[in-house]
């Protein structure tokens, strides 16, 4: 789970 920017949820 990568969460760089508030909006990406991979």
Curated annotation (Swiss-Prot):
Compartmental location: Secreted
Free-text function comment from the UniProt entry: Hypertrehalosaemic factors are neuropeptides that elevate the level of trehalose in the hemolymph (trehalose is the major carbohydrate in the hemolymph of insects).
Family according to the record: Belongs to the AKH/HRTH/RPCH family.
Keywords assigned by UniProt, alphabetized: Amidation, Hormone, Neuropeptide, Pyrrolidone carboxylic acid, Secreted
Secreted found in the keyword field: yes
Tyrosine amide found at: 10
Keyword Secreted listed: yes
Molecular-function annotations in GO: hormone activity
Organism: Tabanus atratus
Main location: secreted
GO biological process terms on file: neuropeptide signaling pathway
Listed name of the protein: Hypertrehalosaemic factor
One GO CC annotation: extracellular region
Positions carrying Pyrrolidone carboxylic acid: 1
């Amino acid at each position: 789970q990568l969460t760089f920017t508030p909006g990406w949820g991979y």
